[in-house]
C-alpha cells in the first residue's frame, strides 16, 4: 500500500513490529542496539517508555545518520506500576492474576529519528484494556503455551491471550506493539513514505 521514499530502519527485533511494517508494504532494514532498560528513580511510566523509544532509536540512528529510524517500546501499566516482560513462568502467572478482572493501560512510545535531517521526535499512545475475571488455573494454562513469556504484561492480544480481553478502548495495534495510524501519519508528514 505504501512505498518508502527514504531509507528506513526498524530499530526492533520484534516479530510483531516487523509484521506490521510488512503489511504496509514498506521496504526497510532491521538494526538493533541493546540499551539498559531500567526506569530511573521517580520516573513515571510515560516518561520511561518515551525515553526507551528515543534511546533505542538514537543508538541506531547514530550509526546510520542518513536513514530514518523507527524505534518503539511498549509497557503495560497497572495502578501506575510498570509490568514489563516476565522474568519466568511464575512471574507471568503472578502478572496475569493481578490483571484478571481489571482494566490496565498499554503504552507504546515510538520514536522517529533522522540524524541528517536533525529530526528526533517521540509520540506516546495509550490504550485501555479490560480483562475478564479468571483464576490461577487459567493463567497457568496460558503460560504453559509459552506465548506470554516475551511480552509486556505477560499476554499477547493477537494470540491466545485475546481470550482474556473483554474490551479495549483505543488502538489495537498499539497493544500489539506499534500504533500504526499514528506512525503512518508521522511518516507521511516527513515524506518518508508515500502511497
Swiss-Prot record:
It is an enzyme of class 3 (hydrolase). The keyword DNA-binding does not apply. One of its GO terms (molecular function) is dTTP diphosphatase activity. Its cofactor is a divalent metal cation. GO terms for biological process: nucleotide metabolic process. The record marks 16, 74, 158 as: Important for substrate specificity. The active site is at residue 73. InterPro entries: ITPase-like_fam (IPR029001), Maf-like (IPR003697). It catalyses: dTTP + H2O = dTMP + diphosphate + H(+); UTP + H2O = UMP + diphosphate + H(+). It is found in: Cytoplasm. SUPFAM superfamilies: ITPase-like. GO terms for cellular component: cytoplasm. Signal peptide: none annotated. Keywords: Cytoplasm, Hydrolase, Nucleotide metabolism. Its EC number is 3.6.1.9. Nucleoside triphosphate pyrophosphatase that hydrolyzes dTTP and UTP. May have a dual role in cell division arrest and in preventing the incorporation of modified nucleotides into cellular nucleic acids. HAMAP family: Maf. Belongs to the Maf family. YhdE subfamily. This is dTTP/UTP pyrophosphatase.
Amino acid at each position: 500500500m505504501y512505498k518508502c521514499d527514504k531509507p528506513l530502519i526498524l530499530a526492533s527485533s520484534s516479530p510483531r513490529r516487523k509484521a506490521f511494517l510488512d503489511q504496509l508494504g514498506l521496504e526497510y532494514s532491521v538494526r538493533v542496539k541493546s540499551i539498559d532498560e531500567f526506569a530511573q528513580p521517580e520516573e513515571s511510566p510515560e516518561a520511561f517508555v518515551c525515553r526507551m523509544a528515543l534511546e533505542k532509536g538514537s543508538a541506531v540512528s547514530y550509526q546510520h545518520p542518513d536513514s530514518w529510524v523507527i524505534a518503539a517500546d511498549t509497557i503495560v501499566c497497572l495502578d501506575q506500576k510498570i509490568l514489563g516482560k516476565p522474568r519466568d513462568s511464575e512471574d507471568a502467572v503472578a502478572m496475569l492474576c493481578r490483571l484478571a478482572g481489571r482494566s490496565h493501560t498499554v503504552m507504546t512510545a515510538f520514536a522517529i529519528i533522522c540524524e541528517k535531517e536533525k529530526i528526533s521526535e517521540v509520540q506516546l499512545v495509550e490504550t485501555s484494556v479490560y480483562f475478564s475475571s479468571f483464576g490461577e488455573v487459567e493463567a497457568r494454562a496460558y503460560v504453559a503455551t509459552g506465548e506470554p513469556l516475551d511480552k509486556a504484561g505477560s499476554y499477547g492480544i493477537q494470540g491466545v491471550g485475546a481470550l482474556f480481553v473483554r474490551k479495549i478502548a483505543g488502538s489495537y495495534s498499539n497493544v500489539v506493539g506499534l500504533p500504526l495510524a499514528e506512525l503512518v501519519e508521522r511518516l507521511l508528514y516527513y515524506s518518508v513514505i508515500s502511497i
